[in-house]
Design a protein with these regions (language model features):
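Short, low-complexity disordered leader/linker segments with a strong preference
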Residues: 1-40
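Short, polar/charged alpha-helical segment
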Residues: 37, 42-70, 78, 145, ...
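Extracytoplasmic ligand-binding site segments that recognize negatively charged/polar headgroups
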Residues: 45-54, 72, 76-77, 92-226
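Periplasmic-binding protein-like
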Residues: 52, 141, 171-179, 202-203, 210-211, 245-267, 281-302, ...
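A ligand-binding cleft/hinge motif common to bilobed small-molecule-binding domains
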Residues: 103-107, 227-246
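A bilobed periplasmic-binding-protein/Venus flytrap-type ligand-binding module shared by bacterial periplasmic
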Residues: 146-151, 189, 259-272, 282, ...
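C-terminal capping/gating helix-and-loop segments adjacent to ligand/active sites or protein-protein/ligand interfaces
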Residues: 289-337
């Protein structure tokens, strides 16, 4: 399925993953039993650094005062590359994983690397989850179409994914690089399933630009370099609500591409009880409210959507179906497309 290499010509990866939160020693203690949860838990995640720093760290520290939670943060593909290397070396440092590519969890489960755990909070989850507890969605991101309302009237903005192939948008549209972005990778797979690979041939012919990530796209939407773009809903909601920027979301009539980001525990963890408690926290109302404060959607049905977004249940009902098994089995081919 190597029809072209155009996505490989995108901007080089600039942002480096960094380790955030406490350093501390390498040894991880198990649960201290009667004394409560203790030791350390290492989480590898693609969730945004500001959410970790401003919401996760203080709330998790309050919930687990005797347990140290460390966070390794990077883009989904960067985190996957790191953990894949550790798996090959048989030195998995992570206790838990949170990245925006459910298909990768299927691979990990097939390799029998995950510790099944059905959280008591899982009954409230309306998003996707493994019935055996290998992984459970913890946040929802949506790939949508965005535009600058200072440059484009709402009635003139693209209303469907197919409209992006219209010649009137030639050279004025963009998308994130699926080689670097897990959500963009999922969007490529979902839209190829819906419209065929010819859809991306048409986008290429229409001069679509492939950017390093969502931040570069939103900046160029603001300057007017792009008229419209595939981008994460959360980026646009944050700018519109916190900085009063004129960026708007056009929710495609042919469905958003919904990307649940699961959490899973590696069966190599030295602190399984601590890792399970962290899963419980993320799936709790408190943890999910932190997700929504980061402008993403909660996986729970009883937590409202972020400001300016439709209710999550409505988006779930109309979202494009994603074949996670197909994505897992055809990872290299999809990225080379």
């Amino acid at each position: 399925m190597k029809k072209s290499k155009w996505m490989l010509g995108a901007a080089a990866l600039l942002a480096l993953s960094v380790t955030v939160a406490g350093c501390g020693g390498d040894d991880k203690k198990a649960d201290s039993g009667k004394g409560g949860l203790s030791g350390e838990v290492m989480v590898y995640t693609s969730i945004y650094p500001d959410i970790i720093d401003n919401m996760c760290k203080p709330n998790v520290a309050k919930a687990f005062p005797d347990m140290k939670v460390n966070w390794f943060q990077g883009g989904t593909e960067k985190v996957i590359t790191k953990i894949t290397g550790e798996i090959k070396a048989k030195k998995i440092a992570a206790d838990a994983l949170m990245v925006a590519d459910p298909s990768y969890y299927l691979k990990l489960d097939e390799q029998k690397l995950l510790l099944p755990y059905v959280s008591p909070e899982a009954k409230n989850v309306i998003s996707e989850k493994d019935k055996e507890g290998a992984w459970t969605a913890v946040r929802i991101s949506n790939m949508i179409i965005a535009y600058n309302s200072d440059k484009l009237k709402p009635e003139d903005a693209p209303k469907t994914w197919e409209e992006l192939t219209d010649p009137k948008w030639k050279g004025k549209i963009a998308m994130p690089n699926p080689m670097l972005s897990g959500t963009a990778y999922v969007a490529v797979g979902a839209l190829a399933d819906k419209y065929g690979w010819e859809y991306f041939d048409k986008l290429k012919a229409n001069g679509i630009r492939v950017e390093e990530g969502n931040s570069a796209i939103q900046n160029k939407l603001l300057t007017g370099e792009y008229a419209a773009a595939m981008i994460l809903e959360e980026n646009i909601l944050k700018l519109a609500n916190t900085k009063n920027e004129p960026l708007k979301v056009s929710y495609p009539e042919d469905g958003v591409v919904m990307v649940p980001s699961p959490i899973a525990i590696f069966n190599t963890t030295k602190n399984p009880e601590g890792a399970k408690a962290l899963v419980d926290w993320w799936l709790s109302k408190e943890g999910q409210e932190a997700v929504v404060k980061g402008w993403m959607h909660s996986v729970r049905g009883d937590v409202p959507a972020p400001k300016g977004a439709p209710e999550t249940k409505k988006l779930v009902e109309g979202a494009n179906k994603v074949d996670w098994k197909k994505l897992a089995d055809n990872n290299a081919e999809i990225k080379e497309e």
